[in-house]
Amino acid sequence: MDVLTLPAYGKINLTLKVLGRRSDGYHNLSTIFQSIALADRLTFSRCREGIRLETSGLPVPQGPENLAYRAAARLQSRYGFPGVRITLKKQIPLAAGLAGGSADAAATLIGVNALFNLGLTPGQLAREGAALGSDVPFCVIGGTALGRGRGEELSLLPPLPTLWLVLVKPSFGVSTAAVYRGWDASPGQTPMEAPDEERALAAIRRGDRAGIMASLGNDLEAVTCRLYPEVMAIKMRLLAEGAERAVMCGSGPAVFGVAADGETARRIASRLQETYPETIVTRTL
């Protein structure tokens, strides 16, 4: 194999509960991850030496600051291969809570493993990914999964009924560290709709769309909305335009609204795109 092209799918959190701060500075979470169709695209090819990363689309670093580069460097140092050229077409909004960087790292682990026949299993790749970021193991596995610990301890779940989504990313990014510091300062702040993980798990297992919808929620939403009130404004706007539910993605600032169908999602998006150019229609996988 000389060239390989892979998608790097983003994610949302259907539910996200913060269980407390750990001694290592991270936080224990319980979250239901869900892959979405919105994706970056990465092409991998062999080169004589080193790691060469070329990017297009949204602006991202091309060196060691990029998680895709760091994923390739990790496998190169641990398992050895001469060199790889990576071409990244970046489409997932940056610093949005959609795991765009983690998705690129996961695709790189998968792509380099296949290109150079390293023979690593998905479980081994997920463990390598855990050293790069908390969301990388899920992005390696994909689909629907319950995450514990930092999010890296995964239990696979049955696939969801398709949910049509309107993603809205404001013009600013959010510091994940700042959001968690805010949570530490005022733990237990109640979001507009608290996540109901047990109900969500039961609904997912029986394919109950209404039950899934009623269970959505994110413990970090109240913190991020206090720090960045526009996130709450986006949430309310999505609901006003016809979204059935609206929940913040990860630590924010992007918000996803769930629409009844694709046509409704496109209509909602058309009403928000003038104010929020980074408004995207996608669906769960």
UniProtKB/Swiss-Prot annotation:
Keywords: ATP-binding, Isoprene biosynthesis, Kinase, Nucleotide-binding, Transferase. One of its GO terms (biological process) is terpenoid biosynthetic process. InterPro entries: GHMP_kinase_C_dom, GHMP_kinase_C_sf, GHMP_kinase_N_dom, IspE, Ribosomal_Su5_D2-typ_SF, Ribsml_uS5_D2-typ_fold_subgr. It comes from the Bacteria. Signal peptide: none annotated. It is an enzyme of class 2 (transferase). The active site is at 11, 135. ATP binds at residues 93-103. Its EC number is 2.7.1.148. Pathway: Isoprenoid biosynthesis; isopentenyl diphosphate biosynthesis via DXP pathway; isopentenyl diphosphate from 1-deoxy-D-xylulose 5-phosphate: step 3/6. GO terms for molecular function: 4-(cytidine 5'-diphospho)-2-C-methyl-D-erythritol kinase activity; ATP binding. It catalyses: 4-CDP-2-C-methyl-D-erythritol + ATP = 4-CDP-2-C-methyl-D-erythritol 2-phosphate + ADP + H(+). Belongs to the GHMP kinase family. IspE subfamily. NCBIfam families: ispE. Catalyzes the phosphorylation of the position 2 hydroxy group of 4-diphosphocytidyl-2C-methyl-D-erythritol. This is 4-diphosphocytidyl-2-C-methyl-D-erythritol kinase. It comes from Moorella thermoacetica (strain ATCC 39073 / JCM 9320). The lineage of its organism: Bacteria, Bacillati, Bacillota, Clostridia, Moorellales.
